């Protein structure tokens, strides 16, 4: 099983950063790789079990299911249902933690998935650098860091 871990510090209070990322349908509002998103069946975007169907700027389409969401613990866990990446059993968590020294937020994004062994290095690098770090870089720009 492949594992990805990326972390960063965002120069903004955790409640403000969480307000930006908690909407399971809101990735186009903060992640530069996402062109559009919709929740299937008209479900609320914070209902565990809802499915988002989104399109990347490169045209690829991905479907993901919300597995967990906590405003108290500031995390969102989701699974990929369909993706052109060639991964299986993909589960990821985006978690925010307040930094007590100043108004900053520790952000971490993790994932575990199965893939062909010969593609693991490439997929881990693309997910870590393109998806996770790309999202953190956009958040840092949005919050002045």
Language model segments and positions:
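Short strand-connecting beta-turns/loops that link adjacent beta-strands
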Residues: 13, 59, 71-72, 99-102
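Hydrophobic ligand-binding cavity/cleft-lining segments
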Residues: 1-44
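Hydrophobic/aromatic beta-strand elements that line small-molecule binding cavities or substrate pockets
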Residues: 6-8, 62-68, 91-98
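Glycine-rich portal/gate segments that line the openings of hydrophobic small-molecule binding cavities
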Residues: 29, 38-86, 134, 138-145
């Amino acid at each position: 099983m492949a594992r990805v871990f990326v972390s960063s510090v965002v120069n903004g209070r955790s409640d403000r950063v969480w307000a930006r990322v908690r909407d399971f349908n809101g990735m186009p509002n903060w992640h530069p790789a996402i062109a559009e998103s919709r929740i299937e069946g008209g479900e609320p975007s914070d209902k565990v079990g809802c499915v988002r169907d989104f399109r990347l700027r490169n045209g690829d389409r991905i479907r993901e299911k919300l597995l967990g969401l906590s405003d108290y613990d500031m995390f969102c866990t989701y699974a990929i249902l369909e993706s052109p990446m060639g991964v299986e059993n993909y589960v990821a968590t985006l978690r925010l933690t307040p930094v007590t020294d100043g108004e900053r937020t520790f952000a971490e994004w993790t994932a575990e998935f199965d893939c062909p062994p010969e593609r693991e290095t490439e997929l881990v690098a693309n997910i870590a650098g393109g998806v996770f770090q790309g999202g953190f870089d956009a958040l840092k720009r949005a919050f002045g860091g």
